[in-house]
C-alpha cells in the first residue's frame, strides 16, 4: 500500500449547523468538528510531507472553487478553504478561524464531492496515493442527486474512498435512530447512502459513533526495522568446516514506545511586551511566527586568582573526561579514552544450549527481537528451520552473543523457538539476558516455614498463614480472575484485559492534550478518556461478585482497623492506645526514655517524640539529636560518617515538621553551618554541608513545608548558596 495520502475534508457550514439537537449543548458544527479536528491535528503532529490534506467549505457565504470559475452551474456557495498539501500549525490556526457557520443553504453536497474529487485528481495525478474524501454534514441542505451515479463512477475510476459521516444520521449497526427526522433530511440521508453504496470503497456512518471512537487510542503504525542482516553461527566457520552458518535477518518484535518529547521555545510577544519561555511539543515548527527556537550556549570556567573576577574561561577542546576514583578523579584524554571501549565486530554467535526447565523468566531483560531467514534464500530457510525444529523437539533454548554492528556493545540473548511452530511460521525470538553485574540477589525468609537458630523447621507459627487463610486467599484469587470476566459479541466469556487493549495512558494522554492545545490554545483540556483509566482499578462488578470471598479473607486474616497516627502539635499529648486499653508500659514496668544514644539515635529519637507530653521534652530530644549530628561530623575520618549524620538530620527534620516545631530545626541548622564553615568541627567539613545537606535537600524548613515556619524560600536558598566551594569532576589541559 502506498504511504502517500491525499485527503479532502468537506465541512457543511450551513445555517442549520449552528443548531443544537438531541440534547447536546454544542452545535452540530462543533460536534462534527470534534472528529475533523482530531484527524487533522493527528496529521499535523505526524509532520510527514507525504500526508497531505485539503478542506472544502459547503454552504459558505462566498464561492471559491475551480468549477464555478470555469462557468459551470451548481457549484455556488462552495469554497476551497485549504488547498491540498502538508499542513502546519500556522495553517491549522488560520483554518480554525475560517470554520464558521453561514446564513445560506445553497451549497450542494454532491457538488462539493466533485470539487474535492477534482482537487485530488489534479494533485495526485497518476501517482500512488491513498485518496480519501470525508464529508461531514447534518443533511439539512437540499441535494441534487441527478449526477450521483456519474460521480460514483468517477470516484471508482480514480480509486478514491468516500466517507460520509452525518450528524444524527441513522445507523442500524451502531444502534442509533433519530426521532422526528425532517422529510428533507431523510431524503438527503437516503441519497448520500445510495451514493456510498455505489462506490467500490465507501463508508457511511453516524457522527455519534465517530466521536465515540475518538476516545480509542490509535496505535502508530511502524515499519519493520531490520536491526541485523548477517550470519547466525555455531562455531567458527573460518576455522572449522563443520561450523554452522545461517544467513538471518533480525527485526524488533517489541520496543518501548516513548512519550512525545518537548523542546523549549520563546513565545514572541507583541511589540513592547516581554517574551515568555514555554516548553512545547518537539514537532512544533520553529519557523512559526509565534515561536522562536532556543539555542543553548555553555561556557567552562576555572578559578584563577590572576584573572578578572577570579575566574577564566576554558575552551571545550582543552577539557578531558574524568572518572571518580574514591575521593579523586582520574582524567582520560581523548586519545586515551579509546582504551575504555571494547573492540567488537558485527556478529551473532550461538554459545550453547540450555533446557526449558533451567531458565527463569525473570531473567528476561529489555526489548524482544525476531530472527528469520534471509528473504529468497532457500538454503538459509532450510538451515534455520532445522535449528528451530531441533530446539522445539529437544525443549531447549540457545544462548547467543549478539553484536549489532562493529564497535557496538555485546549482548547475551536467549533464542526461543516460536511456540506456534505448527502454524508454519518459523522464527526465533531473542530476549536480552542480564550480565552478572545486572543481577540483584537477595535473601528472604521462606514463606512456608520458619527456621530456628538450631536448624529446626517449624510449619506452624504465628508468622505463617494458617490453612484457613491459605484457602481463603486461594478462593479470593480465583474470584478476581480476569481471564474470563469480559463477554464478547456472542455472549461468551473472554479476556478482560487483552494486550491489544491495554494502552499506555501517559502516551495517549499527552497526545490528546497536544492535539487539543494545537486546535484551540485557550480551551480547557478535557479529562482523560475512560478507556485510558479502565485498568487503573479493578472492575466494580468483579469486586461486587467477589465480595463473599473478600469478607472471608478478612475474617481468616483477622484484619482489624488500626487508628490513624495523629499529626500536629495538638495531638502529640495523647499517644495512641492499644485496642485492648491496657497500659503496656505500666505492665512491663518500663519507664519512658529520656536520653538518646549515638548507636541507636534514630529509633530512640522517634520513641521520645511519640511519648512526649510537653514542649520541653521535644526541645530536649532535638538538642540531643543535634549534638549527635555534630559529633558524627567531628569524629568522621574524611567523609566516613557524613551519610550517617545526614540520615539523622533527615529524620530530625521530618519529625519536627510533623510536630509543627520547625523553629528547633532551623535554629540548629543555622548554627551547624557556622560551625562547619568556621572549622570548629575538627577541620574542613564543607563537603558535609554542600554535598550531604544542600545536595540532600536538608535545608531550612520553609513556609511551603510548614505553615508555622517563619522562614521563606528565599531565605532558605540564601543559606544554601553562600560560599560554595569549587568542586569539579572535569579536568583541563593547560595549553599555555
Curated annotation (Swiss-Prot):
Give the catalytic activity. Answer: ATP + H2O = ADP + phosphate + H(+)
Principal localization reads nucleus
Top EC category? hydrolase
Cystine crosslinks: none
Which residues are the signal sequence here?
Answer: none
Q: What domain of life does the native source organism fall in? A: Eukaryota
Q: Which Pfam families match?
A: Ku, Ku_N, Ku_PK_bind
Q: Which GO terms describe its molecular function?
A: ATP binding; ATP hydrolysis activity; damaged DNA binding; double-stranded DNA binding; helicase activity; telomeric DNA binding
Q: Where's it found, cell-wise? A: Nucleus; Chromosome, Telomere
Region Disordered, as annotated, extends over 261-286
Gene Ontology cellular-component terms listed? chromosome, telomeric region; Ku70:Ku80 complex
User: Does this UniProt record's set of keywords contain Hydrolase?
Assistant: yes
All copies of domain Ku, residue ranges = 232-479
Q: Which SUPFAM superfamilies is this protein grouped with?
A: C-terminal domain of Ku80 (SSF101420), SPOC domain-like (SSF100939), vWA-like (SSF53300)
InterPro entries documented for this protein:
Ku70/Ku80_beta-barrel_dom, Ku80, Ku_C_sf, Ku_N, Ku_PK_bind, SPOC-like_C_dom_sf, vWFA_dom_sf
Example GO BP: DNA recombination
Keywords (alphabetical) are: ATP-binding, Chromosome, DNA damage, DNA recombination, DNA repair, DNA-binding, Helicase, Hydrolase, Nucleotide-binding, Nucleus, Telomere
Return the EC number: 3.6.4.12
- Name the family: Belongs to the ku80 family.
- What is the protein's quaternary organization? Heterodimer of Ku70 and Ku80.
* Described function: Single-stranded DNA-dependent ATP-dependent helicase. Involved in non-homologous end joining (NHEJ) DNA double strand break repair. DNA-binding is sequence-independent but has a high affinity to nicks in double-stranded DNA and to the ends of duplex DNA. Binds to naturally occurring chromosomal ends, and therefore provides chromosomal end protection. Required also for telomere recombination to repair telomeric ends in the absence of telomerase. KU70, of the KU70/KU80 heterodimer, binds to the stem loop of TLC1, the RNA component of telomerase. Involved in telomere maintenance.
Protein name (record): ATP-dependent DNA helicase II subunit 2
Native organism is: Chaetomium globosum (strain ATCC 6205 / CBS 148.51 / DSM 1962 / NBRC 6347 / NRRL 1970) (Soil fungus)
Amino acid at each position: 500500500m502506498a504511504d502517500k495520502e491525499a485527503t479532502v475534508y468537506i465541512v457543511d457550514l450551513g445555517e442549520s449547523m449552528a443548531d443544537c439537537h438531541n440534547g447536546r449543548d454544542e452545535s452540530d458544527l462543533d460536534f462534527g468538528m470534534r472528529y475533523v479536528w482530531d484527524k487533522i491535528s493527528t496529521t499535523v503532529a505526524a509532520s510527514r510531507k507525504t500526508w497531505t490534506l485539503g478542506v472544502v467549505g459547503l454552504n459558505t457565504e462566498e464561492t471559491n472553487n475551480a468549477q464555478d470559475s470555469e462557468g459551470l452551474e451548481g457549484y455556488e456557495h462552495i469554497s476551497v478553504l485549504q488547498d491540498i498539501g502538508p499542513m502546519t500549525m500556522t495553517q491549522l490556526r488560520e483554518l480554525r478561524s475560517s470554520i464558521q457557520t453561514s446564513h445560506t443553504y445553497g451549497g450542494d453536497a454532491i457538488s462539493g464531492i466533485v470539487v474535492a474529487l477534482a482537487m485530488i485528481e489534479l494533485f495526485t495525478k497518476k501517482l500512488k496515493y491513498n485518496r480519501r474524501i470525508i464529508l461531514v454534514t447534518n443533511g439539512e441542505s437540499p441535494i441534487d442527486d441527478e449526477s450521483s451515479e456519474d460521480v460514483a463512477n468517477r470516484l471508482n475510476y480514480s480509486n478514491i474512498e468516500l466517507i460520509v459521516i452525518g450528524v444524527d444520521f441513522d445507523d442500524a449497526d451502531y444502534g442509533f435512530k433519530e426521532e422526528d427526522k425532517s422529510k428533507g433530511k431523510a431524503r438527503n440521508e437516503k441519497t448520500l447512502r445510495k451514493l456510498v453504496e455505489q462506490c467500490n470503497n465507501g463508508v457511511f456512518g453516524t457522527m455519534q459513533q465517530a466521536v465515540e471512537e475518538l476516545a480509542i487510542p490509535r496505535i502508530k503504525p511502524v515499519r519493520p526495522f531490520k536491526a541485523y542482516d548477517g550470519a547466525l553461527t555455531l562455531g567458527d566457520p573460518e576455522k572449522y568446516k563443520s561450523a554452522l552458518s545461517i544467513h538471518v535477518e533480525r527485526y524488533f518484535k517489541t520496543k518501548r514506545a516513548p512519550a512525545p518529547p518537548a523542546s523549549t521555545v520563546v513565545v514572541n510577544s507583541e511589540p513592547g511586551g516581554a517574551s515568555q519561555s514555554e516548553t512545547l511539543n518537539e514537532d512544533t515548527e520553529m519557523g512559526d511566527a509565534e515561536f522562536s527556537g532556543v539555542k543553548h550556549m555553555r561556557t567552562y570556567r576555572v578559578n584563577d586568582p590572576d584573572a578578572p573576577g577570579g575566574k577564566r574561561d576554558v575552551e571545550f577542546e582543552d577539557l578531558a573526561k574524568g572518572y571518580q576514583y574514591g575521593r579523586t578523579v582520574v582524567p582520560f584524554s581523548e586519545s586515551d579514552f579509546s582504551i575504555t571501549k571494547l573492540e567488537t565486530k558485527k556478529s551473532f554467535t550461538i554459545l550453547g544450549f540450555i533446557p526449558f526447565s533451567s531458565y527463569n523468566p525473570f531473567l528476561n531483560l529489555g526489548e524482544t527481537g525476531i530472527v528469520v531467514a534471509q528473504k529468497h534464500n532457500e538454503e538459509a530457510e532450510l538451515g534455520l528451520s532445522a535449528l528451530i525444529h531441533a530446539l522445539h523437539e529437544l525443549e531447549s533454548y540457545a544462548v547467543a552473543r549478539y553484536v549489532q554492528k562493529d564497535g557496538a556493545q555485546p549482548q547475551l540473548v536467549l533464542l526461543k523457538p516460536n511456540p506456534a511452530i505448527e502454524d508454519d511460521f518459523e522464527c526465533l525470538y531473542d530476549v536480552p539476558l542480564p550480565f552478572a553485574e545486572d543481577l540483584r540477589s537477595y535473601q528472604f525468609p521462606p514463606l512456608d516455614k520458619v527456621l530456628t537458630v538450631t536448624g529446626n523447621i517449624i510449619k506452624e507459627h504465628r508468622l505463617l498463614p494458617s490453612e484457613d487463610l491459605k484457602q481463603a486467599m486461594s478462593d479470593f484469587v480465583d474470584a478476581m480472575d480476569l481471564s474470563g470476566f469480559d463477554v464478547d459479541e456472542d455472549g461468551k466469556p473472554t479476556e478482560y484485559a487483552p494486550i491489544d487493549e491495554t494502552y499506555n495512558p501517559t502516551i495517549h494522554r499527552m497526545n490528546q492534550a497536544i492535539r487539543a492545545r494545537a486546535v484551540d490554545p485557550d480551551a480547557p483540556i478535557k479529562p482523560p478518556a475512560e478507556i485510558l483509566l479502565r485498568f487503573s482499578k479493578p472492575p466494580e462488578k468483579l469486586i461486587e461478585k467477589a465480595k463473599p470471598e473478600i469478607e472471608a479473607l478478612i475474617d481468616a486474616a483477622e484484619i482489624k482497623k488500626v487508628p490513624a497516627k495523629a499529626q500536629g502539635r495538638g495531638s502529640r499529648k495523647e499517644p495512641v492506645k492499644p485496642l485492648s486499653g491496657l497500659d503496656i508500659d505500666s505492665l512491663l514496668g518500663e519507664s519512658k526514655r529520656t536520653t538518646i544514644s549515638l548507636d541507636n539515635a534514630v529509633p530512640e529519637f522517634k520513641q521520645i517524640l511519640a511519648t512526649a507530653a510537653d514542649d520541653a521534652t521535644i526541645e530536649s530530644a532535638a538538642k540531643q539529636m543535634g549534638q549527635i549530628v555534630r559529633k558524627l561530623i567531628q569524629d568522621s575520618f574524611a567523609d566516613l560518617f557524613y551519610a550517617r549524620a545526614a540520615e539523622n538530620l533527615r529524620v530530625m527534620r521530618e519529625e519536627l515538621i510533623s510536630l509543627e516545631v520547625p523553629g528547633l530545626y532551623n535554629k540548629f541548622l543555622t548554627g551547624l553551618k557556622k560551625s562547619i564553615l568556621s572549622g570548629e568541627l575538627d577541620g574542613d567539613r564543607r563537603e558535609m554541608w554542600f554535598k550531604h545537606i544542600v545536595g540532600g535537600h536538608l535545608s531550612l524548613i520553609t513556609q511551603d513545608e510548614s505553615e508555622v515556619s517563619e522562614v521563606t524560600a528565599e531565605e532558605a536558598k540564601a543559606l544554601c548558596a553562600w560560599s560554595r566551594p569549587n568542586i569539579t569532576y572535569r579536568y583541563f589541559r593547560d595549553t599555555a
